[in-house]
Every structure is written in structure tokens, then in C-alpha cells.
From Swiss-Prot:
Transmembrane segments: none annotated. Glycans are attached at N59, N96, N260. It comes from Meriones unguiculatus (Mongolian jird). It comes from the Eukaryota. GO terms for cellular component: extracellular space. The record marks M371, S372 as: Reactive bond. GO terms for molecular function: serine-type endopeptidase inhibitor activity. Residues 1-24 form the signal peptide. This is Alpha-1-antitrypsin. Pfam families: Serpin.
Amino acid sequence: MTSSISWGLLLLAGLCCLVPSFLAEDAEKTDSSHQDHIMASNLADFAFGLYRVLSHQSNTTNIFLSPLSIATALAMLSLGSKDDTKAQLLQGLHFNLTETSEADIHKGFQHLLKTLNRPDNELQLTTGSSLFVNNSLNLVEKFLEEVKNHYHSEAFFVNFADSEEAKKTINSFVEKATHGKIVDLVKDLEIDTVLALVNYIFFRGKWEKPFDPELTEEADFHVDKSTTVKVPMMNRMGMFDVHYCDTLSSWVLLMDYLGNATAIFILPDEGKMQHLEQTLTKEHIYKFLQNRHTRSANVHLPKLSISGTYNLKKVLSPLGITQVFSNGADLSGITTDVPLKLSKAVHKAVLTLDERGTEAAGTTVLEAVPMSIPPDVCFKNPFVVIICDKHTQSPLFVGKVVNPTQ
């Protein structure tokens, strides 16, 4: 397909993460464990790639995103791409196409999403994808079948000629899917947009061991050497999985949710954030998740709500994903009516971190602590946060808190 004009495709990946709900406590054991490992490993590589690009672009702003959400949207898009466009998308997701077949890649995503979407009364995790198609466009039936089978995606027809109405329809869908936490995801639509692909994740978690709101108090958070802000600081003394990692020059705190997810908070020593970002690998994450030990500690963690909105074209290009944005894109597997290119890709993520845990009416939990003086671990400087699925060890969300008040 050759043309000097390519019509626009809009890619939207939206995430809402209310930290302290998630996956089933015991995901069923299947023959997919090896497949899960491959998916988790590739997602981790992709996650760190995304994080480092954003960190390099600015070291003074918060970062929060879902590599799973972005990867799912790109994998869906690859179903309708061909030749070099397809290869770039899948290789950008760190798949070796000589070792893993395209069919296995999509089966891997299908299984992972099925695992994550398991119902759990204690936890809330919902992922989903939808296509918004111009009402004059005919989509390839095979593409529709495959995105439905592998990604449970629905297709909705809208009139992109009426950009305000189309924008309203998409934003209303995302707002409803994320329980009102992501609003106005689409600020504007390119005049040539004929297709929008939306992927979203809604996450609400409850700590296994919640903080007491009565103990939350105002404290200083040091954004940098010259900037200090006041934040509500959550406080708890008890048994924590916390240790000091010499390799990373950082304190590492693991906090479990009810269900099958863990948050990893990594607090570097003053002036060591760059060292942490250059040194941290997926192997560190696996080690933290596999070697669990608790000790008595005083932990102080800021209560916060941050968000990030990203132009994925700027983020994905350094990772080698470029052709899909160009007039040379081959997305003829989606439609043969008009030549398509990805005109805009937007990802929005929202993180809320608070004291909430189990609503245990009239129940008090007392923990025995050793007589030795416990370490005081205070997250009063910028830190990294990674939220993982314990079953697959997939990094579902990654971020950096530079300023909790922004």
C-alpha cells in the first residue's frame, strides 16, 4: 500500500491505580508457567526501557505508568500490522521473533490478562481494550476476530468528522471504565483520525497491614536540595519486609496487598537516585520478590496522589518503535479502505497512595517486635515504586515520586 497521505489512528492507554486490589490469591496452575515467565521477563525489559526514557527526558518530574497497559495496546496493534511495522512493534516489546512465534506472543498476553482479571472480592483489577472506528470505515474481519479472542476487545462506531462528539464518546467510555478516576483523556483529535484504540486498567488495592490514619501527620519532603514541601506522612511501627541494599545504595521496602500483588518501594541515599536508576535491573526485582524476610522497623511513607500523561510517540521512538507513526506504516491488516498510520498515542496513569487497608470492624492487630532498636525508614526524599503481580512476577506499574504534591 503506497500513498502520500495516511489517515490517523489514535492509541490510548489509560491507567488508574488506587494503591491500597488485585489478583486472585492462588492463580490456577497451568502449563503456562513457562509462558508466564517469558511474558514477565519481556514486560520487565520493556518497563525499564520506558522508565529510563522518561527519566532521561526529565529528572525533575514524577513518573507513573503501566508497561502492561502500553504493551497490551501495542500487541493489539501488531495484529493489524505487517512486515517491518509488525516486526518493530514486537521487537520493541522485547520479543525475539526467531524464538517466540507471534501466535505464542498473543496467547501469552491472553493468559496474562485472564490471570489478572480473575474476580477477587478483596481486590479490584480490571483491564480492557476497545476500538473506536469511524462509521465509514470497514475493518478486516480477521483483525476484529483476533482482537476479540485474544484481548476481549469490543469495537464501537463513531463519527470522527464530529470531533467533539467523538472525543466525548471516548472520554466517557474511559471515565466509566476507570470508575471516574481518568477523565478527559483525549484533549484533542487529529482532523484525520479514523480509528482509536483504547486500553485501560483500573486497580484498587488494600494493604495487608494498613496504616492508622490517626498517626498520619504533616512532615517535610525534600524534592531536591533547594525545594522542600509539606506532605501528610503515614507512620507505622511493626514488622516489615525492609532491608538496605548495598548494590543500589537504597532502602528497599516490600508491602503486600490483600490478594496477589506487592508494592516495592526503593529509597536511594541522598544524591544516589541516578546510581539507582542506572543499576536497578529486573534481576533485583526477582530477588526481592523471592527472598522475603521481615524485621521490626519504623516506616514513614507519604500519602499522595500523582498522575502522568505521556505522548507515547516521544517515549517509544527511542525504543525503536518509529515506523508505525510514519507514512510508511503498514497497518493494512486493520483496514484496506485507507492507508493508516498511528497519528497519536496517549497514556495516562493515576496513582493514589493512602492508609486504607482491610475494614476490620473492632479488630486490632498486635505485632511482637524484638527488643533491639528498629531502623527508621523515612521516605522523605524521591523514591521509586514498582507494583508487581506475585504469581507471574510481572511489573504492572512503575514510577518515581519526585514531588508528592504535584
